From Swiss-Prot:
The organism's place on the tree of life at top rank: Bacteria
Classification via SUPFAM superfamilies: S-adenosyl-L-methionine-dependent methyltransferases (SSF53335)
A Gene Ontology BP annotation from the UniProt entry: tRNA methylation
Family, per entry: Belongs to the class I-like SAM-binding methyltransferase superfamily. RNA M5U methyltransferase family. TrmA subfamily.
Biological classification of the source: Bacteria, Pseudomonadati, Pseudomonadota, Gammaproteobacteria, Pasteurellales
Organism, as annotated: Histophilus somni (strain 129Pt)
Xref: InterPro entries: MeTrfase_TrmA_AS, MeTrfase_TrmA_CS, SAM-dependent_MTases_sf, TrmA_MeTrfase, U5_MeTrfase_fam
Reactions catalysed: uridine(54) in tRNA + S-adenosyl-L-methionine = 5-methyluridine(54) in tRNA + S-adenosyl-L-homocysteine + H(+); uridine(341) in tmRNA + S-adenosyl-L-methionine = 5-methyluridine(341) in tmRNA + S-adenosyl-L-homocysteine + H(+)
Entries under PROSITE patterns matching the protein: SAM_MT_RNA_M5U, TRMA_1, TRMA_2
Enzyme class: transferase
Protein name in UniProt: tRNA/tmRNA (uracil-C(5))-methyltransferase
């Protein structure tokens, strides 16, 4: 079992705080709001390769520096539920040769609502015999008290024993939000820190006037929680499974002022600028929206220059970043027109150098 340096957690977080403070200093950022993580069992998903050794097999990971493999029986950064499943699953898999033969990876996705998806990945075609054994495995796990979905994956094959999603329930500001999370789609890995991010975003946008535009909305994680602060919300997302999950989440949370369209941020920028018309915007009149606030949560590469220019047209910008270096590149442009009103560090990834951050920008008065 790996041991976490829990006694060093506060010092490691303070280092990140200092680093991010230094990075944001050229942009006249106010002091950071800092949101700590749980010190163990904070990660809601995990992926392991499977190593076969004679009649035995076990979870492994690879050391990023040495590339050496090491055995994992327990994984203290992963949720308690994932650790319980890791212990329960392997002995049951060993009872079914068809389930272990050419199995090379196991992915786990768990929720605070105590549900879990187990994805078994194979270098072989999955057949009826596999399905029967997997069904038996699922029943054995249910008998042990797990609320579990089993998925088999192989080349150009995906077999769901029931469904490929779990419904998460997140407590945010004395409310509970339901979020459908689809296997193999992006979800925030640290659920408790995600709740803190949502609460910070709600606080930033409190008493907002007008409407909100969100680019890269995923399963609606932010837009659903923020809808309460706006007259209307328009959100874009490119991944089909995420859009479907977002539509479910809108209905499940009884949100009636949020509309999601499936298109890239780049295409949406062209539509907003009137460069060309898009079929996907049929039935949506962009003129109906008075979006004076924009929310962006871009990939690690940050915003491309065309999107930066689009974003600068808005009175208020809420920017969540998973890469402080590309955030700072974008801020070199954004702070020409906007000032940083609030900034935050969210420790999504304890014991690593990764920093999740947020800035709330307000347009400078001329």
């Amino acid at each position: 079992m790996q041991r976490l340096p829990i006694e060093q957690y506060s010092a490691l977080l303070a280092e990140k705080q200092q680093k991010l403070t230094e990075l944001l200093a050229p942009f006249n950022s106010p002091p950071l709001d800092v949101f700590a993580s749980e010190t163990s069992h904070f990660r809601m998903r995990a992926e392991f390769r499977i190593w076969h050794e004679q009649d035995d097999f076990y979870h492994i990971m690879f050391d990023q520096k040495t590339k050496q493999r090491f055995r994992i029986d327990q994984f203290p950064i992963a949720s308690q539920l994932i650790n319980q499943m890791m212990l329960a699953l392997l002995p049951l898999l060993k009872q079914h040769n068809i389930l272990t033969h050419r199995l090379f990876q196991i992915d786990y996705l768990s929720t605070l609502s105590n549900k879990i998806i187990v994805s078994l990945l194979y270098h072989k075609t999955l057949n009826e015999e596999w399905l029967q054994a997997a069904t038996q495995l699922k029943q054995q796990l249910i008998k042990q008290g797990f609320d579990v979905q089993i998925i088999g994956r192989a080349n150009k094959q995906k077999i769901c024993l029931q469904q490929d999603f779990v419904d998460e329930i997140l407590p945010v500001k004395n409310q509970q939000y339901i979020y459908r999370q689809v296997e193999n789609s992006f979800t925030q890995p640290n659920a408790t820190v995600n709740c803190k991010m949502l609460e910070w975003a709600i606080d930033c946008t409190k008493n907002s006037q007008g409407d909100l535009l969100e680019l890269y909305c995923g399963n609606g994680n932010f837009s659903i929680a923020l809808a309460q602060n706006f007259r209307k919300v328009l959100a874009t997302e490119i991944a089909k499974p995420s859009v479907s999950a977002a539509q479910f989440n809108i209905a499940a949370n009884k949100i009636d002022n949020l509309h999601i369209i499936r298109m890239s941020a780049e295409d949406f920028t062209q539509a907003m600028n009137g460069v060309r018309a898009f079929n996907r915007l049929k039935g949506i009149n962009l003129q109906d929206y008075q979006c004076n606030t924009i929310f962006v949560d871009p990939p690690r590469a940050g915003l491309d220059m065309a999107t930066v220019k689009l974003v600068q047209n808005y009175e208020r910008i809420l920017y969540i970043s998973c890469n402080p270096y590309t955030l700072c590149e974008n801020l070199q442009e954004l702070t020409k027109t906007h000032r940083i009103e609030k900034a935050a560090l969210f420790d999504q990834f304890p014991y690593t150098e990764h920093m999740e951050s947020g800035v709330w920008l307000i347009k400078k008065s001329n």
